[in-house]
UniProtKB/Swiss-Prot annotation:
Record carries keyword Cell membrane: no
Record-stated family: Belongs to the WXG100 family. ESAT-6 subfamily.
InterPro entries referenced in this protein's UniProt entry, alphabetically: ESAT-6-like_sf
Keyword Transferase (UniProt): no
Compartments, record wording: Secreted
GO CC, one annotated term: extracellular region
Protein name, UniProt field: ESAT-6-like protein EsxQ
Transmembrane segments: none
Domain of life: Bacteria
Alphabetized UniProt keyword annotations: Secreted
Organism, as annotated: Mycobacterium bovis (strain ATCC BAA-935 / AF2122/97)
Amino acid sequence: MSQSMYSYPAMTANVGDMAGYTGTTQSLGADIASERTAPSRACQGDLGMSHQDWQAQWNQAMEALARAYRRCRRALRQIGVLERPVGDSSDCGTIRVGSFRGRWLDPRHAGPATAADAGD
C-alpha cells in the first residue's frame, strides 16, 4: 500500500494557489475577449461598416442590378429592339438596329455607288 500523506496546511495552500490561478485565467479570458472584439470594431474602414455588413450590402446591390438588367432586356424584347435567337434558351439576344433606308456602301469602291450619287 502506498503511503499517502495529507497535510491540511498544504491542501489549503494548494486551494489558495488554485483560486489565484482561477482569477488570473478569468482576467486573461476577459483580455482575450476584448482583443477579439477590437479588430471587428477597428475594421470598420472608410465606410464605417464591418466587412460582413459591406458584403451584405454588395450582394443586395448585385441582386438589384441583375433584376434591373432582366427588366431592361424584357422591355427591349417587348418593343422589338431585342430579339431572342431561335432555339436559344439563354438570356442572350441580338440587338436589331432599325431598318436601313439607304444603300449599303461597298468599302472596296472608293467612288460614288451610282451616277446619281456623283451629284451629291
